[in-house]
Amino acid sequence: MSEINTANVGKETQVGAFLVRGGALDVDYCYDDEKKELEILTEIPLIISNKKPEKETGTDIIMNRNQEYHITLENVNLTDETHRGGVRIRNGKAVITLRGINFIRGGINLTNAESAQLEITKESGGFTHVCGIGGTYKEIVINGGNIKAVGGAYAAGIGGGLREGAGNITINGGTLEAIGTGWGNSNGIGCGQWGSGGTITINGGHVRAFGGSTGGSNPPLPKVCGIGGDNVHILVNGGVVEGYGNNGGSDFGGIFRTAPDGNARVTGSIEDTLDKENWNGIINDEVMGRVILGEDTYIDRLTVAKDAELLIPGGMILVNYGTLVNYGKITVWDNPGIPSKSCICNKGEIRNSGVIDGWNENGSVQTV
């Protein structure tokens, strides 16, 4: 990648309904008033906003060249009128930061080239409503942000369109709600209607995904998943992950796995249980394998399976409002050098037929 010149960042130019900060018009970006397209030309970082955020525009943002793009969408309000995507990445990799409140109706679409990639940065903040993230060829990485992605007709909220697979989707963080909707059935995250294949990896964040259905029955519509789809490989390593299927589909459909050191909290029915003995995480309120809490956790019900272990490290608390059932081992563990204590704060009932152990005098079970 060539060195990025940031000398012009901060300048503001109006192009159509947008304000662009950074770069120079007709050098780093250009505007076609007839086509209503803002095309990004170089790697220089750009900040794009609506001049009037309360008023939506029909102008699309497009990236055609095989290079790395760096753009920030800040209070963008656009509606795609071409049905090809409000933000279109034809070639290259787009690194996008989301700020403020963004509405992208028509979605973020990766089209026509296997080289097209999308990365949403962990610096993203505010709230973004996107009508679908995906396309024909997809390499999608979401590192942060507060994003709601709603699929169009036959399309997943994040992933494929009609007869398309999921592509390669990685979620590392953020708060994400994905809904498959539009005319016909589609998965929340995964394949579009009648699509097959792809991979979904979830390493962190709070993810909620809903399979959608809004009508049509000839031919009969397929079952849809919250996350996955036909022959989709799902690897859940961390975060809080909820799936909600539709039309008789599982909440998680496809080939389901966890990492050997996974600590995700997963909620939803899982179609594929062939690897269940190797699952590691809190899955449907049951601790499986060896799980180290990565954040304060609040439960109404939790069971630690036989031969499973739940470790609560220094600075973390487990708050029980309902029933905690332990058949395995719970370790309350204070790390040297971390001043805050770890504990189980019990506001309900603990049923223990296993071991609850503290690694030193600070580890505690506190009943409130």
Feature map (PLM): residue ranges:
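A composition-driven surface/loop motif
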Residues: 1-368
